Amino acid sequence: MTATAALLAEVWGILETVEDPELPIAITDLGLVRTVQVADGRVSVRLVPTWTGCPALDVIRARVQGALRALPGVREAAVEYTYEEPWTLDRMTPRGRARLAAHGLAVPRCRFSEPAACPSCGSHDVTLDSLFGPTSCRATYVCRACRNPFERFKPPADIALSRE
């Protein structure tokens, strides 16, 4: 394995430890990492934001840069956001979906328009409490079956489509 290939593997490994500040999930499992390039001790990471106006973008960038700069052999770490293609639920890994569900956050399989399921009891007998949850990427619901409130991840592309 070349030094560049070894560093690339280390970079991917360290990215798996960087968590989103608003969600209990690594940015790799959330599907934020679009590309990683390594050359001569320089690392360049391109991220896809879940929401364009997400207030956590600067925090995520700082966390990624800090983690990368701590790696031996990294002289320079550049992190930028790309808006070439929108983030979608398809980018999230099964492990990421499971972590969010374990945290009590429902995640639609593919579209926000799917019926919501309570992460506590699995019931679909739920009601939307507010489309505007504690962060721009979550909505709040209440389960009629177990009476637990819960949050549901909402993909931005689906919300925009539902308003047309």
Please give the residue ranges for each predicted region.
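Domain-level signature for proteins that mediate thiol-based redox and metal-cofactor handling
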Residues: 1-164
